């Protein structure tokens, strides 16, 4: 008798995998185990909740029970997996255990909180539960410090500013989105945020936070201090790898998988933000969607290696949206930038004259798909 497939996690990757499995097999036993409620919500919406005056419960799209009925699943919400016995094919919680034929880790990634004095005063917005826990202080806060000027930090800074709050955006780097693109490309967004009223503290490092009567005092390494009502950590994500380590599979930055999404154990797979695919961590929607398609086939007996095409990454800053693709972080590219009132096109060219990366903004985003076709990968 088939023990079926167990998926640990209930986020976007887990749900996409369930949908793809059920397209091919309506009856294989499917069990999902997760620490949260397993209700569905759209994670990118978290970048806009404050300006849209949305509460955490407003984000829910489908209740867990409806999901289970629709796709013929066994769900175990609010359940912490404590151990995986890979040789015995058993998943354990504090009071239950489940046997499996195939196991999929879809455990996601956790927000990184800098290890500074007062770190417990930092809020994170990496999932619906985290927003639910801090929505009242965030809605009430007038002065907000966002630590981290990457994708999420930039999106949140614009959103809080649009909601009428006084926003300070801090980063160690000399420019925003520094891990994704050079300053001459990100400067358009940087200038727009400044024009909106966002106060940028670049080349700045947070040293400590302390509670004071008027809110929170944030002290920088330069010994300058600012007073705010709330501090948000947007300093990146760290793949959740603890369960994989307990199962004895190979872990690097994420759970190491090959082109078949298979870990070092033949019956354990990983997908989504927790996975490191052939050395790459790809915490974006499109690679997760494609991974789910291929993994569903392989779990059901197929043998199809994942092939990822050139893909767009979207920066969700509504007043100056950006799309980017390719190796935008490469330092050896020569950038050709055309900036006009309706938007920007920035092309990253190799020494051989090949298009290796591009960034487009505003009305020029309509040219993204044509550029994708000419991108050298």
From Swiss-Prot:
Coiled-coil intervals, chain numbering: none
Pathway recorded for this protein: Nitrogen metabolism; nitric oxide reduction
Highest rank taxon of the organism: Bacteria
Cofactors: FAD
Cited InterPro entries: FAD-bd_OxRdtase (IPR050260), FAD/NAD-bd_sf (IPR036188), FAD/NAD-binding_dom (IPR023753), NO_rdtase_NorW (IPR023961), Rbx-bd (IPR041364)
Keywords for this protein: Cytoplasm, FAD, Flavoprotein, NAD, Oxidoreductase
Gene Ontology CC terms: cytoplasm
Molecular-function annotations in GO: oxidoreductase activity, acting on iron-sulfur proteins as donors, NAD or NADP as acceptor
SUPFAM superfamilies to which the protein is assigned, alphabetical: FAD/NAD(P)-binding domain
Pfam families named among the record's database cross-references: Pyr_redox_2, Rbx_binding
Family: Belongs to the FAD-dependent oxidoreductase family.
The protein's name: Nitric oxide reductase FlRd-NAD(+) reductase
């Amino acid at each position: 008798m088939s023990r079926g497939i167990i998926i640990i996690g209930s986020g976007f990757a887990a749900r996409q995998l369930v949908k793809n499995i059920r397209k091919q097999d309506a009856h294989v036993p499917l069990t999902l185990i997760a620490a949260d409620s397993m209700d569905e919500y759209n994670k990118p919406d978290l970048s806009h909740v404050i300006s849209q005056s949305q509460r955490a419960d407003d984000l829910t799209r489908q209740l867990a029970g409806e999901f289970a009925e629709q796709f013929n699943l066994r769900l175990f919400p609010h359940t912490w997996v404590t151990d995986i016995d890979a040789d015995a094919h058993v998943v354990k919680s504090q009071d239950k255990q489940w046997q499996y034929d195939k196991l999929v880790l879809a455990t996601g990634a956790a927000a990184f909180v800098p290890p500074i004095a007062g770190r417990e005063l930092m809020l994170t917005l990496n999932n619906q539960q985290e927003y639910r826990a801090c929505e009242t202080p965030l809605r009430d806060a007038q002065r907000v410090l966002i630590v981290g000027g990457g994708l999420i930090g930039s999106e949140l800074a614009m959103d809080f500013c649009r909601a009428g709050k006084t926003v300070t955006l801090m980063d160690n780097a000399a420019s925003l989105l520094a891990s994704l693109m050079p300053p001459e490309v990100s400067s358009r967004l940087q200038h727009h945020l400044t024009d909106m009223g966002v106060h940028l503290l670049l080349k700045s490092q947070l040293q400590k936070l302390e509670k004071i009567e008027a809110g929170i005092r944030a002290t920088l390494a330069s010994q300058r201090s600012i007073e705010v009502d709330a501090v948000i950590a947007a300093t990146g994500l760290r793949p959740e790898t603890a369960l994989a380590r307990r199962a004895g599979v190979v872990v690097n930055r994420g759970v190491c998988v090959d082109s078949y999404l298979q870990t070092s154990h033949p019956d354990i797979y990983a997908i989504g933000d927790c996975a490191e695919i052939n050395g790459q961590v790809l915490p974006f929607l499109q690679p997760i969607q494609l991974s789910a398609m291929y993994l569903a086939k392989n779990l059901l007996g197929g043998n199809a290696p994942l092939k990822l095409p050139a893909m767009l990454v979207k920066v969700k800053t509504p007043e100056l949206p950006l799309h980017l693709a390719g190796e935008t972080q490469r330092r050896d590219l020569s950038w050709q930038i055309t900036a006009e009132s309706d938007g920007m096109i920035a092309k990253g060219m190799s020494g051989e004259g090949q298009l290796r990366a591009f960034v487009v903004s505003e009305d020029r985003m309509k040219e993204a798909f044509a550029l994708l076709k000419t991108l050298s990968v």
